[in-house]
Amino acid sequence: MKIDMHCHVREGSIDSKVPIEEFIKKLQSKGIGGMLVTDHDTYNGYRHWKNTIKGRKYKDFVVLKGIEYDTLDAGHILIIMPQGVKMRLLELRGLPLSLLIDFVHHNGGICGPAHPCGEKYLSFTNTKRWQKSPELIEKFDFIETFNACEPPQSNEGAKYLAEKYGKPGTGGSDAHKLDCVGMGYTEFPVRIETELDLIRQIREKGEIQSGGEYYTKTTKDKIGKFNKLLIFSFWFYNRG
């Protein structure tokens, strides 16, 4: 079963242009059976699904609850908690990485760095926390090894880390636009129905594979050097 494990929907991420229903339809057309909603520091996109769509449409498609968390010191971290576990603290950006990992694990969840070899401040290996505490990578449950919006060298670096530290590698599109949806995915040997199913598969380190194709129309590709200013703005925002 293929799942896009890095999805931003309009109902939850202010920088996404894709409503969750369009996301689902596009994924279905590509033969992908599920998605992990990972909006920035909010579960609002998933709440929209749960409150207005779930059980009424797309009953053969799996929508899972996740989040892309903005840490104080280590960039963006993908988090999955068991269904039924409500963690409003995860919607308050800015926890330091070590505290975040302990909090997630204490409550039965898993976490891993998004695009770990990507942009400065946003990606774990390009932060001061990695330089000061590289051993923290051992505490991750997985590493995102394919992100459709990252360049090949970034994903290759992530794959190297996953192999070096014995972590499962996940994949996702990181889509904010419709034409990027489904360009990255994680493939599991069994069907995933719930967040707990996903957590178990990753913890068991089964035959999980990541893959996809590269998306070359990202905002950072278009705006060039101005992207560095935006990245610094993200860092400053998380310091607030």
Question: Model segments located where?
Answer:
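Short, well-ordered coil/turn segments that N-cap beta-strands
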Residues: M1, G31-G34, K59-V63, N107-G109, ...
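Charged catalytic cores and adjacent phosphate/nucleic-acid-binding surfaces used
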Residues: M1-M5, V9-S13, K17-K26, Y46-I53, ...
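Divalent metal-dependent hydrolysis catalytic cores, especially in the metallo-beta-lactamase
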Residues: D4, H8, I24-N44, I110-G112
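Short, well-ordered beta-to-alpha junction loops that form the rim of enzyme active sites
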Residues: H40, A114-C117, A175
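Core dinuclear metal-dependent hydrolase active-site scaffold
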Residues: K86-L89, H105, C111
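Caspase-like (clan CD) cysteine peptidase catalytic core
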Residues: E91-R93, L97
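Aromatic-lined carbohydrate-recognition surfaces of secreted/lumenal glycan-active proteins
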Residues: I110-L122
